[in-house]
Structures are given as structure tokens and as C-alpha cells.
Amino acid sequence: MVLSPTDKTNVKTAWGHVGAQAGEYGAEALERMFLSFPTTKTYFPHFDLSHGSAQVKAHGKKVGDALTQAVGHLDDLPGALSALSDLHAYKLRVDPVNFKLLSHCLLVTLALHHPQDFTPAVHASLDKFLSNVSTVLTSKYR
């Protein structure tokens, strides 16, 4: 899906509200994903997956940092996320459906923390953005 100029503005504005909490929200979304979709835990057998775990927080920061990088490169997501795509495709071998599950949990997390900013238009733009990120991260699986 191509992000329109309005989508790009919505994504940048919404992510601007996230700011320094990107890692925190990433960890919350991961925790929500593990609770809602227990099969996703199989990729983290070495993690302490309990609430507030330092390992989940650290991985949440990686997720938040990657999304912040992606927001900064909306016109070149494949270039910005190439190394991460390689990692997930060739080393970690994460089932592509898990990116959709995490995207959903990220949307829920953002809606909970920023209900006043989470309009239907912003929701749609963020959904398109996260879908594009998921597509890039799974592009090297083929």
C-alpha cells in the first residue's frame, strides 16, 4: 500500500506524540501480543516473558527504535529496514503472520495511550504504515 501525503503526515504526527515512549510502547505491545497470541512466545524461549521483564523491555526498545527509524524514512522503508529484514528472514526465521499480530497490538497500545489523537484517519494511516513495515520485513522470505 502506498502512503499518501496525508498518511505520511498522520504517521509522523502520531509518532511525534509517541516520542521517548517508543520503547515503552513497544514493550507493552509485545507483552500484549504474548498474552493475546501465546504461540508468538515460541520465538522467545530464552526470555523471561513476565510482566515488566527486562528482556521484554529491551526488545520493546528495539521495536520502538526500528519504527522510529522507519517513520524517519517513509519514502525508503526497504532501505531503512534492510538489515532488520535480513535478520528476521535469514537468522530468526520469524513466521510472517507474527508481524501482523504485533502491528495489531501496537495499534491497540497507541489507541489506549493517545485516544484523543487516534482518529479513524490516523488509525487507517498507522495501519497502512505498519502493514508496509511488515511487508518490508517479510520481503526477503521469498
Curated annotation (Swiss-Prot):
Q: Name one GO cellular component term.
A: hemoglobin complex
Modification Phosphothreonine occurs at:
T9, T109, T135, T138
Alphabetical GO biological process terms: hydrogen peroxide catabolic process
Positions modified as Phosphoserine? S4, S36, S50, S103, S125, S139
Q: Where does this protein hold O2?
A: H59
Asked if the Swiss-Prot or TrEMBL record annotates the protein with the keyword Heme, the reply is yes
Q: In which tissues is it expressed?
A: Red blood cells.
What region holds the Globin domain?
Answer: 2-142
What SUPFAM superfamilies does the record tag this protein with? Globin-like
Q: Which UniProt keywords apply?
A: Heme, Iron, Metal-binding, Oxygen transport, Phosphoprotein, Transport
Query: N6-succinyllysine modification sites?
Result: K8, K12, K41
Q: Which residues bind heme b?
A: H88
Q: InterPro entries under this entry?
A: Globin (IPR000971), Globin-like_sf (IPR009050), Globin/Proto (IPR012292), Hemoglobin_a-typ (IPR002338), Hemoglobin_oxygen_transport (IPR050056), Hemoglobin_pi (IPR002339)
Quaternary structure and interacting proteins, as annotated: Heterotetramer of two alpha chains and two beta chains.
Give the PANTHER family listed for this entry: HEMOGLOBIN FAMILY MEMBER, HEMOGLOBIN SUBUNIT ALPHA
Role, per record:
Involved in oxygen transport from the lung to the various peripheral tissues.
Per the record, the similarity remark reads:
Belongs to the globin family.
| Name of the protein described by the UniProt record | Hemoglobin subunit alpha
Q: Which organism is it from?
A: Ceratotherium simum (White rhinoceros)
Name of the encoding gene: HBA
